């Protein structure tokens, strides 16, 4: 590599400079404090671990996004975490082994071999919250409410919510006896709202099932989409009715808690279909193609770790949250410039630091001209035998 190219970073990999790094860290602390006030306990997961553990129950999408290396100590294949959620699920199932509901949260960098979407980061800072041990819609309402509280605290403007339930499609596909290949093709067509393809793929199915699967491409919009779903899916199997009723219950609770929040429903929404088992949700803002936060229910993920538990949660990219939010996270760059040496100087500097002041001490050869570059607007000066804080001379 030529010397001139040594500063280049791989596509999708970023460095964060001051003051942006300070804004991100301030947001991280505020969000984790918010999670704490809701009763969520902070956990830290490994950056890298054995691949079979990292990908257990996570699905093919995560496999494709995971950087893989060989551990020189054991010869086994390892992966850098591309999603913290499965790691936290393992903690709940294997390490904590609590009987009742467990609320956990996390924040950390992840690494993607492939970006989530065009022009997105491959090194996001993933931040999220998970609730284990309760299968009721009340848990889904709690984590969605926490997510919305987080977005409100970050002052993300004009948020609207998209909600769906993968159990609706899964129940209809099971009742229709679709082969794995046809189910995948229909899944792709529904995601693209390709009505002609949906009609072709369901042409050989019995009338009621055919009509209900086709209806999923059209059952989207405001609250009326749920009411239409009740009518057009009235003949669906019990598991589909249960899924639809769960979605309606969650929608009612959110409408009561957040009366001004725009809610959009899509009964053919299959985000995370191979991973999620129930309600799926995402928060969007105008002009941004990707969701700013997303999540859903993923029951029984802990089964591969020896203990199946209901689970629901959400995650966000902290860097995106700071970029799209309008909260005042800027920390005023100020400080006190102290000379390199002097009688009693060390004690005076430490007193100021213990009082919460930012003090930058000069290194040999530096003078007050370096103070501005160090972000200082005051100086420590010896006057009448005492060290005193004074304005920095211009």
UniProtKB/Swiss-Prot annotation:
Instruction: Give the principal location in a single coarse category.
Output: cytoplasm
Associated pathway = Amino-acid biosynthesis; L-histidine biosynthesis; L-histidine from 5-phospho-alpha-D-ribose 1-diphosphate: step 1/9
Could you tell me what this protein is called? ATP phosphoribosyltransferase regulatory subunit
Q: What family does the database annotate?
A: Belongs to the class-II aminoacyl-tRNA synthetase family. HisZ subfamily.
Question: Taxonomic classification, please?
Answer: Bacteria, Pseudomonadati, Pseudomonadota, Gammaproteobacteria, Pseudomonadales
Q: Does the keyword Cytoplasm apply?
A: yes
Annotated GO CC locations? cytoplasm
| Source species of the chain | Pseudomonas paraeruginosa (strain DSM 24068 / PA7) (Pseudomonas aeruginosa (strain PA7))
What functional role does this protein have?
Required for the first step of histidine biosynthesis. May allow the feedback regulation of ATP phosphoribosyltransferase activity by histidine.
């Amino acid at each position: 590599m030529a010397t001139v190219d040594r500063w280049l970073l791989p596509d999708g990999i970023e460095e964060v400079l001051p003051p942006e790094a300070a804004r991100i860290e301030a947001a991280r602390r505020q969000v984790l404090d918010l999670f704490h006030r809701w009763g969520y306990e902070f956990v830290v997961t490994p950056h890298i671990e054995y691949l079979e553990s990292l990908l257990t129950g996570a699905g093919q999408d995560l496999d494709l996004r995971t950087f893989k290396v060989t551990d020189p100590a054991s010869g086994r294949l390892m992966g850098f975490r591309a999603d913290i959620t499965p790691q936290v699920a393992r903690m709940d199932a294997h390490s904590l082994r609590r009987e009742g509901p467990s609320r956990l949260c996390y924040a950390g960098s992840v690494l993607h071999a492939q970006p989530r979407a065009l022009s997105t980061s491959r090194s996001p800072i993933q931040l999220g919250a998970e609730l284990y041990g309760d299968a009721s819609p009340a848990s889904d309402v709690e984590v969605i409410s926490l997510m919305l509280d987080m977005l409100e605290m970050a002052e993300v403007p004009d948020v609207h919510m998209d909600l769906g339930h993968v159990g609706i499609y899964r129940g209809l596909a099971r009742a229709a006896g679709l082969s794995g290949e046809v189910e995948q093709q229909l899944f792709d067509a529904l995601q693209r709202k390709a009505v002609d393809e949906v009609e072709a793929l369901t042409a050989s199915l019995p009338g009621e099932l055919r009509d209900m699967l086709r209806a999923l491409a059209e059952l989207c919009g405001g609250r009326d989409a749920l009411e239409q779903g009740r009518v057009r899916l009235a003949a669906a199997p019990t598991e589909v009715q249960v899924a639809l009723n769960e979605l309606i219950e969650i929608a009612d609770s959110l409408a009561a808690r957040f009366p001004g929040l725009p809610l959009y429903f899509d009964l053919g929404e299959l985000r995370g279909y191979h991973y999620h088992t129930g309600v799926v949700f995402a928060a969007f803002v105008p002009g941004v193609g990707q969701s700013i936060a997303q999540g859903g229910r993923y029951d029984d993920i802990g089964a591969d770790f020896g203990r199946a538990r209901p689970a629901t949660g959400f995650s966000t990219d902290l860097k995106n949250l700071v970029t799209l939010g309008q909260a005042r996270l800027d920390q005023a760059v100020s400080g006190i410039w102290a000379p390199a040496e002097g009688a009693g100087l060390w004690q005076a500097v430490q007193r100021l630091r213990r009082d919460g002041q930012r003090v930058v001490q000069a290194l040999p050869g530096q003078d007050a001209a370096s103070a501005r570059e160090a972000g200082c607007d005051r100086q420590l000066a010896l006057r009448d035998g005492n060290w005193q804080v004074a304005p920095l001379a211009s």
